[in-house]
Regions:
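Glycine-rich phosphate-binding active-site loops on the catalytic face of alpha/beta enzymes
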Residues: 67-82, 245-257, 296-314, 344-378
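Active-site-adjacent beta->alpha loops and helix N-cap segments on the catalytic face
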Residues: 30, 79-88, 146-150, 194-214, ...
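Catalytic cores of alpha/beta
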Residues: 60-63, 235-243, 282-300, 340, ...
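Bateman/CBS regulatory modules and CBS-like beta-alpha motifs in cytosolic regions of diverse proteins
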Residues: 30-44, 51-53, 82-120, 127-129, ...
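Short beta-strand/loop segments at the ligand-binding rim of alpha/beta enzyme cores
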Residues: 43-50, 96-101, 216-226, 267-282, ...
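Catalytic beta/alpha-barrel core
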Residues: 73-77, 103-104, 124-126, 164-165, ...
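Alpha/beta catalytic cores of nucleotide-metabolism and tRNA/nucleoside-modifying enzymes
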Residues: 1-24, 104-105, 166, 226, ...
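Short beta->alpha transition motifs characteristic of CBS
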Residues: 74-79, 122, 126, 133-149, ...
């Protein structure tokens, strides 16, 4: 047997190797349906997931992407308590009704109230007694000119003619009550005057401004959180679930591993009611193993990211388009969606990833330069950049991602074997601006393919192209005089 016949088992193609073939279409880009699944039970309005990277997704990013209709995965390079706090921030950022509002006891002081307002970034707090009955409400206006920090809340709160509603009131009626009485916060009480929730004018306004937001059944923004495979994985998961996380992502460099599969089984036993997504993988065989172990979603991508060096350092990987297609074939009929993670440079790559069988795409470098990313802002040669690093970079591994690459027992930094780099990306403005262009490109691609929704896009066909075809696809034989918001020359 020859080496090629015996050892080469597949052709590996990535996004630049193919183009989608246009088809007869009765679909206009503006009419396509972009809703999809993140995991078995979590639906998205747009197929975009921000990566669990410490220069990409914390609460600010997760809030922003959820408001656009996607979901963010908060990274794990922080303490359990801090990651849970980040999740809680997202869950409190927007509500239909806040079911567990921050409250203060009637015997508390002005200082206590101000501390709570500062901690939770809120402008008003319901005041309750020991039985949780509503006795008043205190707002910034009540405290603005108060100098005695030890004064009891009872003496400064609003306690007369408090406007309330009951849990059965619909949002349209609530909006009318808020406008009629010119108030911003409406306590929700039961028949015994016990506080059961709080509705704010700000949340109603946000819901109207962002009708496509990705929300749970209680009207709260959805958020996922990443965990590794460590001794404290279950402790971290419990804290995240208690904080309100909608899904957990077991995030490793090699998801087709005995240790990952065992941890997944253990996690599903402890937390049967929450969706658990597992990655990363690159083969159909890996997908089948994870689904059999209980995965509610899988993440595909071994080395395609711009800051990942796994393929060079370890010599391992599968070009991303082929990996997505192979996993998609294996998952057919299971009801388990896949996330195409990495290798995306243009909106056209998103269309290709979804056409190959993806249900959503995970984006890192595309959003790392946005205002909402936690990366450090840098000025270089008069231009603004933000830091962006792989979770396999030395810098990230020092901060907690060693376990992702199965090196958690290595304490000496010099003995770590990195599989990523630290870099910088141009500042890109707000996440909304980036997502707007990505969604626009996706809609255009679906229109060309005649695909009214993502499921139909899975039926699209590809043509393989040469290097000359790649060059022809990009602007050529000209000097660009005005940059487009959705294109830059490949480096």
């Amino acid at each position: 047997m020859s080496f090629i016949a015996d050892k080469i088992v597949m052709d590996g193609l990535t996004y630049d190797d193919v183009l989608l073939i246009p088809a007869y279409s009765e679909v206009l880009p503006k009419t396509v349906e972009l809703s999809t699944k993140f995991s078995r039970n979590i639906e998205l309005k747009i197929p975009f997931v921000t990566a669990a990277m410490d220069t990409v997704t914390e609460a600010k990013m997760a809030i922003a992407i959820a408001r656009e209709g996607g979901i963010g995965v908060i990274h794990k390079n922080m303490s359990i308590e801090e990651q849970a706090r980040q999740v809680a921030i997202v869950k409190r950022a927007e509500n239909g009704m806040i079911y567990d509002p921050v409250t203060i006891k009637r015997g508390s002081t002005v200082a206590d109230a101000l501390a709570l307002m500062a901690e939770y970034k809120i402008g008003g707090i319901p005041v309750v007694d020991d039985e949780r009955c509503l006795v008043g409400i205190v707002t910034n206006r009540d405290l603005r000119f108060e100098k005695d920090m030890d004064k009891r809340i009872d003496e400064v709160m609003t306690k007369e003619n408090i406007i309330t509603t009951n849990p059965t009131t619909d949002m349209e009626a609530v909006s009318q009550i808020l406008q009629e009485h010119r108030i911003e916060k409406l306590p929700v009480v039961d028949k015994d005057n016990k506080l059961v929730g709080l509705i704010t004018y700000k949340d109603i306004t946000k819901a109207k401004d962002k009708p496509m937001a990705c929300k749970d059944s209680k009207g709260r923004l959805r958020v996922a959180a990443g965990v590794g495979v460590t001794n404290d994985t279950l402790d971290r998961m419990k804290a995240l679930v208690d904080a309100g996380a909608d899904a957990i992502v077991i995030d490793t460099a090699h998801g087709h591993s005995m240790y990952v599969i065992e941890k997944l089984k253990e996690a599903k036993k402890c937390f049967p009611d929450i969706d658990i997504v597992v990655g990363n993988i690159a083969t159909g065989e890996a997908a089948k193993a994870l689904v059999e172990a209980g995965a509610d979603g899988v993440k595909v991508g071994l080395g395609p990211g711009s800051i990942c060096t796994t393929r060079v350092v370890a010599g391992v990987g599968v070009p991303q388009l082929s990996a997505v297609y192979d996993v998609a074939k294996a998952l057919k009929g299971t009801g388990i969606p896949l996330i195409a993670d990495g290798g995306l440079r243009y909106s056209g790559d998103v269309v290709k990833a979804l056409a190959a069988g993806g249900y959503s795409v995970m984006i890192g470098s595309l959003v790392a330069g946005t205002e909402e990313s936690p990366g450090e802002t840098i000025i270089f040669n008069g231009r603004k950049f933000k830091s962006y690093r792989g979770m396999g970079s030395l810098e990230a591994m020092e901060h907690g991602s060693k376990d992702r690459y199965f090196q958690s027992s290595t304490s000496d930094v010099k003995k770590l074997v990195p599989e990523g780099i630290a870099a910088r990306v141009p500042y890109k403005g707000t996440l909304y601006e980036v997502i707007y262009q990505l969604v626009g490109g996706l809609r255009a691609g679906m229109g060309y393919c005649g695909a009214a929704n993502i499921e139909k896009l899975h039926d699209a066909k590809f043509t393989r192209i040469t290097n000359a075809g790649v060059l022809e696809s990009h602007p050529h034989d000209v000097s660009i005089t005005s940059e487009a918001p959705n294109y830059s020359r490949p480096e």
